[in-house]
Amino acid sequence: MALTFTEKKRLRKNFGRISSIIDIPNLISVQKESFVRFLQTGTEFEKMKDTGLHGVFLSVFPIHDYAGTVSLEYVSYALGEPKYDVDECLQRGMTFSAPLKVAFRLVIWDENEETGTKTVREIKEQDVYLGEIPLMTNTGTFIINGTERVIVSQMHRSPGVFFDHDRGKTHSSGKLLFSARVIPYRGSWLDFEFDPKDLLFARIDRRRKLPVTTLLRAMGMSSEQILERFYEIETFRKEGVVWQKRMVPERLMGNRLNYAIVHPESGEEIVKAKKRVTARHIKKFEELGMDWLPVSQEELIGSFVARNMSDVMGEVVIEAGAEITEEMVQYLEDGGIKEIDVLFIDGMSVGAYLRNTLALDKNSGQDEALIDIYRMMRPGEPPTVDAAKALFNNLFFNSDRYDLSTVGRLKMNSRLSLNTELHIRTLQHDDILGVVDILLKLKDGHGKVDDIDHLGNRRVRSVGELLENQVRIGLVRMERAIRERMSSAEADQLVPHDVMNSKPFSAVIREFFGSSQLSQFMDQTNPLSEITHKRRLSALGPGGMTRERAGFEVRDVHPTHYGRICPIETPEGPNIGLINSLSTYARINEFGFIESPYRQVKEGTPIDQVDFLSAIDEENYIIAQANAKLGDEASEEDALIQCRHKLEFMVATPDRVNYQDVSPKQTVSVAASLIPFLENDDANRALMGSNMQRQAVPLIKTDAPLVGTGIESVVARDSGVTITARRTGVVDEVDAARIVVKADEEPGSTEPGVDIYNLTKFSRSNQNTCINQVPLVKNGERVTAGDIIADGPSTQIGELALGRNVLVAFMPWNGYNFEDSILISERLVAEDVFTSIHIDEFEVMARDTKLGAEEITRDMPNVGEDALRNLDESGIIYVGAEVKPGDILVGKVTPKGETQLTPEEKLLRAIFGEKASDVRDTSLRLPPGVAGTVVDVRVFSRRGLEKDDRAKLIDQDEIALLRKDMAAERRIIERDADERIRNLMNGKPVRSAPGLQPGDHISQSWLDKSPSSHLRDVVLDDDAITQQIEGIRHHVEKAADRLKKRFESKVEKLERGDDLPPGVLKMVKVYIAVKRKLQPGDKMAGRHGNKGVISKINPLEDMPYMANGTPVDIVLNPLGVPSRMNVGQILETHLGWAARGMGFKIEEALKQHRKGVADVLRRQFEEIYDNTRESAEIAALSDDQLVDMAKNLQYGVPTATPVFDGAIESDISSWLNKAGLPTSGQIQLIDGRTGEPFDRHVTVGYIYMLKLHHLVDDKIHARSIGPYSLVTQQPLGGKAQFGGQRFGEMEVWALEAYGAAYTLQEMLTVKSDDVAGRTKIYESIVKGDDTFEAGVPESFNVLVKELQALALDVTLQRDD
């Protein structure tokens, strides 16, 4: 495979030994494919499947009125164009959505009262607007009210039937009580369970239990039918004085009988009493032709009658299921009945559970059973047979009320061995009988119960399906209202629009996207956190579990997770195991089950055919691991191979293997597969490592890891933060905000031959980090479709770059790295190595209040001129102003109510005028802890109101920018068209042209000096080319028209004003960029779960340094490694050092190359990239490309050590050796303070360190006075509320122990909730007096009031 554009700039040296069979699938396809399935975009209406939005409409409609004379039918639906594009929605706080219009048909019927037939009287068809459907962006997110959100996929229990037991916990004897549960997609749950007496009961929706036979009778089965369905029948007959039973050899096999078996004629004893019946005995029975076996009468007594037995008159005298007694046998003999059918129940392989349940059941017929079920479901309502029948039918057999779903039917069929059609999604009688059958067999010891945590029993509901369920809820809410409107009004005058109220529909959609537990604010800290959020699987949410109820089994790793769900990446804390991540190669199939890819193995040799298997399919195969040596690679030592089969590990010979893993990283998620040497880390630390990579803040200067895993480029590409080329071509124009690629011309094509890519510049992410895109290409460079042409945040040359490569020493340093603290060099701060930019958004609204409108103004009461220096005439801060805490960003005044004025105030008003007193200053000020530069201001004014000067100015700038963009895009398209037209005309004969004779050929020189306007006057001889030129011109006109319309639409939206929340007149948003340098208290981490807090920034000259004078950047504590068992960081240190050393070698070679020494650079590259694929690609590069790559590699050769297939010890040693570094990975360091060498050699190398989003600036907080709680009058808590520090119970004990009585008193009174005391102490401080007097704390008053609320009369007696 040829190198991509970015690989030609910088190629990773790969230490992996296993080549990949298939590429990693698109990492956000989980979201995108599900949403496409929901809308079925791009599918013709006639070819749409009955799923998604279309399927919901089909399932709810047609709706009939109560009389059955009017029906509303669904015809089709169409989505309109979104009103605002993605960027506009983000800026204006709008939802990115498209209007949904549905065509409905209202049919009015005439009924012939005599014949009862219906004829159509009238049909009215109409498009009805149902509301807005949010659309998914190209990156798999939704823009809801201006914020980017992700709908997380939900893991839930698959519909179908599940068999289980209580593990002996219910009953004291430890007996296993078996149960079964039929779970539909929607509808009533049906449970079957045994009680401790071994009777079988059924429950509907977890209500009171009923004997299972009541349910079977309600289905129309008689006692005889029930027994016949679940039991085999034995026949006894009386021959003379001896009872005989029909011989069934299978039933006798292995049994010991209490009596001997004797041949009836010869009297030969075939089996002795108390001896086991063997296969030899059975063979002898067949040889002797014994069909009947003589038995004693005792064997018959205690059996159960299989069928009803009637007397001569036809009256039933013995009912099916009755126990046979001696009297009954005598009665039958007296009645001349010589043959009797009994149930085969031997108490060992078949138990009498169902027969005993039948005996317990008081109901005798179907009607009684139905009424019993009705009473249980609707207690207190008078039952009738018809109502009971309707209720029972609606519970399980009506498709409107009960839906197993296709998945449920599939699972039902496979578990019960049925062949019911998949479109039959209600319960069938066979399903219920099949469930009871398997339950009885389980009780008899046949078969196994299901494992609820098996991924064959859990499925994923992605965006499309979750949205489909919400749409159904909305339509069902509308259904009742539609039916009532159709019934009440005059049907003749109705049109579809009249009967529909779309409010419930749009409310449900809005509620789902806005407040559902699964609709989450996207984690946009860095590209990895975005991807992980979209690939997340949650077991929580509506219809899922709750944290409190989830036990260990649900959270645990299950063998079926292999290749489907990552065993490493899950949150720490209460959600552990409930929130998971999809594995790298996993995909979700149409039924919602997770599939993993496997490579086929035929006769011991792997072939290039890859199949995706679900957890259920996988169990039937023997699967080898990715590193198994099969086929040509196998040696004699590989006669037995480690495999997986039926959830267990085993060894097998190569010829028995069916499949092989496609890659070693298919078991883990994206985040875990970014950790090099993952195989050398403890799982707990790997979990922390994968979680902390998602918290890494994008830095100003990005740096891809020297030690990577090879999938950094995949993450960068699929995350959507980079820009990829749509078509192959040559870069025509590049600046900071736009890239223009001139696409390769396809013969005969008239489409515009340019692609224009606009870059995002310094915009704010959800987590306040900075999103900025930077071009990677230069003019004239060639790019291929799919190449990365611009970097985004946390990416470098098309690879994920979350942190920086820094030189680390593992050694203690004066206690500054005690307990995971980190000592860093001043260089990291001075050179902005870990500096990041954060953009904070502050907004203020001017509302219409009862006392009048608030006003955004520069004219505020009691504010000095100095505070207004950065505000413009409208009272809004200038862009570019440096601001610090307390500065006014937007001036605002609010009217206040009239109050009684003191004489002094009256005097002041008389002197200084009215304005100052009737308004108060409610300006937006910068909160503590934020200081930076204003980078953007946006003013939104309510539609219809006059805009202020600043808003007009912003609009003018925006329009000027839009006009400039439109002109530039038009110029680019016209220039490209002009070039193509000139190329087509070159050398062609003309009929007429300015300055040419008919028949002359157009020359290049004529084209060079002719302006574009002359080309329009040229008439060519060749009509086909003329037509092609006209096509190109037509496309240019169309493109120009499209650009003009887009420009006009955007201008119109700007001038129109904004849709603001009710009561808001104006809204101003101010964006402030804050530069955050590294400082003590910031949290840093590596990729192996090695985290710590910066304790000290050490001067460069004090840091330990190497013999060549290079000081280390970071000193880490070596004690952080052994107990944590994350040795991966040490291996990374060694390999990182070697990679950096190789960079020095390339730097030397580059210097030699510049001096004109031929081939030295190429030889150096050949030494580094020594595996076959890479060396072939390097050999194909030109000298210029090689020099270009060398410039990027001189600071270190990036390596890839894929998870579970990475560099081994010998690789690292050999690389250290090649780089001219000690193979021990240790070196003599010198103390920067004393200049003396340390006693021992120290492990030194390059580690990839991340700066995490836990910055001390966001956490540090101080308060002197601030807000108080309304009820208790105690200070609020937390930085967000500007709260105080809690002085809790234990802190009180500490002060009591010290005997600090006065300190304690002020803590519990004036500093907390003594309202009067607070005021007094303020006054006394003002007077210069430092004494205070404590009053009654407000919390005491609260206690008194609470006691009074309990009707206890508590009064306060004062000792005066």
Swiss-Prot record:
It catalyses: RNA(n) + a ribonucleoside 5'-triphosphate = RNA(n+1) + diphosphate. One of its GO terms (molecular function) is ribonucleoside binding. GO terms for cellular component: DNA-directed RNA polymerase complex. This is DNA-directed RNA polymerase subunit beta. DNA-dependent RNA polymerase catalyzes the transcription of DNA into RNA using the four ribonucleoside triphosphates as substrates. Pfam families: RNA_pol_Rpb2_1, RNA_pol_Rpb2_2, RNA_pol_Rpb2_3, RNA_pol_Rpb2_45, RNA_pol_Rpb2_6, RNA_pol_Rpb2_7. The RNAP catalytic core consists of 2 alpha, 1 beta, 1 beta' and 1 omega subunit. When a sigma factor is associated with the core the holoenzyme is formed, which can initiate transcription.
